[in-house]
Amino acid sequence: MRTELLRFNGAVERDPAIDAWMRAHAGELGAIAQEWFEVMRKCGDEVRELLHDGCPVACLGDAPFGYVNVFTSHVNVGFFHGAALPDPARLLQGAGKFMRHVKLRPGTATNAAALSRLIDMAYLDIKARVENG
């Protein structure tokens, strides 16, 4: 059974609200969030973005594939269809039907190559979902 894709109205090429969000989240945690959101932004020319539920979201057109959010002591890099992503490095956390996230903490080593692959796979996954209806 196929489920309808989640769609967000208002995604734009570069959302000034996200730049303001990044400025408001300065410091170590903000730098981590900005680093990984930049990776999402660079996935392709069709990437759009918006602030949704208080955090930066990366979309393919209006279909979201990833987000970042800053918490008290960590950053989440999240994936809207993360449950469907291959995760050989076992970075993904969460038990929901669709979403998963990777928790990043300052001073703790990050498997950057594996996280970059997850972001790439999330982008390719949403692209296939959009193209195949």
Report each predicted region and the residues it spans.
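Charge-dense, helix-prone N-terminal extensions
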Residues: 1-133
